């Protein structure tokens, strides 16, 4: 709950592995943690709603892609469950996804520490421009003050929804870094928007 309100994550990336380590079968750990994420995300969203620290337009676009991604994830989950391989899939998914995200964040942390030690002042943009920013259907998100292709949040939602369905997480541990580095949203709007998306994605799971 504390992590949910502070960082905009549901906490599933911590609780689901913890439940598995306690001896609970992965298939049940995923289902149980989805309920916990839904409750904590709803509470956090209400708080950010009253504080007006949410970008609803961005959130709805991510949700649109998220519901489709969740549907694909459920199909994948059902397939591997049918061939009795779902436990292995969940374990491998956690290992690879957390390792990849952790390595990127570790790299950024080391670079920032090195920059501080060298006392180098770098004026940088909110986010780096990648090929994905050249996609069509650009739209203005006035709350976040960004001008971005509508396909970016939709594609992000598909990825988040797919991972959420398989791993039993809200996907915020992936969504929050993407909002910062890929979309360039203001930090103050990210927790509320992330929790808002998590309600619908996890609820569909």
Residue ranges and their predicted role:
Residues 173:
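Periplasmic/extracellular electron-transfer cofactor-ligation site
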Residues 117, 186-187, 195:
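Structured core of small recognition/catalytic domains
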Residues 4, 8, 12, 16, ...:
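Alpha-helical transmembrane segments in multi-pass membrane proteins
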Residues 50-159, 181:
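Juxtamembrane transmembrane-helix boundary motif
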Residues 24, 184-185:
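Helix N-cap/coil-helix junction residues
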Residues 13-59:
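Juxtamembrane transmembrane-helix termini in multi-pass membrane transport proteins
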